[in-house]
Amino acid sequence: MSADGVTFGQAISKARKALGLSQKELAARVKKEESGGSISPQYLNDIEHDRRSPSSGHLIRQFSGILNIPEDYLFALAGRLPDDLRTDASDPDKVVRAFASFRKTLKE
């Protein structure tokens, strides 16, 4: 959930509706994996109603690209780290320095 109370599912639902897409249409565009089939409309419905979370970073990136929502925002709403940050997150000192820098930036 974001600071303004928006959940991942709400963000997806709002953006989908703004683009005039049905759940079935959006589900058909979102691929499970690089070479996989599409997600089901029921799975999308569960995500939009916050009954399920996206199962992978790949799905989050798909939603981002299709719905024109910043990828980092969706990862934050999903409570996940993007794949490219996971290796950096394994170094506790690096995480502490990054968080301190982030806090300083917010205070400015």
Model-flagged regions — what are they?
Residues 62, 73-76:
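Short, solvent-exposed amphipathic helices
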Residues 33-34, 51, 78-82:
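The DNA-recognition helices of helix-turn-helix-type DNA-binding domains
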Residues 78-108:
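Interfacial/linker helices and their anchor residues that mediate assembly or domain coupling
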Residues 20-46:
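Short alpha-helical DNA-recognition segment
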Residues 30, 48, 59, 78:
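DNA major-groove recognition helix of helix-turn-helix
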Residues 38, 49-65:
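Short, basic-rich loop-to-helix N-cap that marks the start of a DNA-contacting helix
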Residues 1-21, 28:
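A short, Lys/Arg-rich alpha-helix, primarily the initiator
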